[in-house]
């Protein structure tokens, strides 16, 4: 998984995750380590680019929602970009959908302003 960290608007640090392929429960463990490191480091703003993801396990969606709640507790957020219609359906079928979706990284960055 490729990860970038950049300084964005209002001096907020925004991290990017760019996973690829299928995000399974086992595959989520790598992402989870990075999410925990972000929290420990005081970084609470994340954009996940799903343009290279072919499938996401529904249990992973639940875990992402839990992390989003943790980030929001500290004034941050997790936002998604480049979500295919297939992935959107998986996310929507989870029952509720708290994530903001943007068509591009630039649009998501602006939303953190």
Regions found by a protein language model. Name each.
Residues 112-113:
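Receiver (REC) domain switch/output surface
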Residues 8-12, 39-41, 106:
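Inter-domain helical "communication" segments and dimerization helices
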Residues 85, 106-107:
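Acidic phosphotransfer microenvironment of two-component signaling modules
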Residues 25-99:
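Amphipathic alpha-helical interaction surfaces in cytosolic regulatory modules
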Residues 1-18:
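Short beta-strand/loop segment at the start of cytosolic alpha/beta domains
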Residues 100-105:
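Short acidic-hydrophobic, aromatic-tinged amphipathic segments that line or gate anion-handling sites
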Residues 18-19, 49:
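A secondary-structure boundary/capping signal
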